[in-house]
Amino acid sequence: MRCPSCNSLDTQVKDSRPTEDSAVIRRRRVCMACNFRFTTFERVQLRELTVIKRNGRRVPFDRDKLVRSLQISLRKRPVEPERIETMVSAIVRELESGGEAEISSETIGEIVMEHLRSLDDVAYVRFASVYRNFREAKDFEAVLGELSSEDDPRRVPLRK
């Protein structure tokens, strides 16, 4: 593994452990050339996924983009980073095990919304507003109506 500080290839793993859900191995490394310490994560990748965008363009699936969009939806919400990482891993596993090498951005959006719906109401509404391209207040009212008819004890509810 190349050192991110000095670009040396002479690095060693000092500590290695699985994450809570055992889907990722966290490795603590040290560069033998400059003593820089850094962390890497190792994940199983079942297949290369290609995303078919709404305009028909095909792009490689980007796990980091998924993480960023969830972090934006969950900004200032009482959800631990570990739960976000667990959710991202579950979404990626679901996508990879679906049997298709190409998957539409709409399908990804729906899967993300399913996971957010069971995690946090506010994040769900935030994500839905961008994903579904809300234009009017009634768009929000429709989603809020859906949420108020459900009762999931794992979810962080909207304030009443």
Swiss-Prot record:
Listed GO biological process terms: negative regulation of DNA-templated transcription
Ranges for domain ATP-cone: 49-139
Region ranges (Disordered): 1-20
Ranges of biased composition (kind: Polar residues): 1-11
Record keywords, A-Z: ATP-binding, DNA-binding, Metal-binding, Nucleotide-binding, Repressor, Transcription, Transcription regulation, Zinc, Zinc-finger
Essential cofactor(s): Zn(2+)
A GO term for molecular function: ATP binding
Species per Swiss-Prot/TrEMBL record: Nitrobacter winogradskyi (strain ATCC 25391 / DSM 10237 / CIP 104748 / NCIMB 11846 / Nb-255)
UniProt remark on cofactor binding: Binds 1 zinc ion.
Known function: Negatively regulates transcription of bacterial ribonucleotide reductase nrd genes and operons by binding to NrdR-boxes.
Stretches annotated zinc finger (unnamed): 3-34
Pfam family for this entry, one: Zn_ribbon_NrdR
Name of the molecule in the record: Transcriptional repressor NrdR
Membership in a protein family: Belongs to the NrdR family.
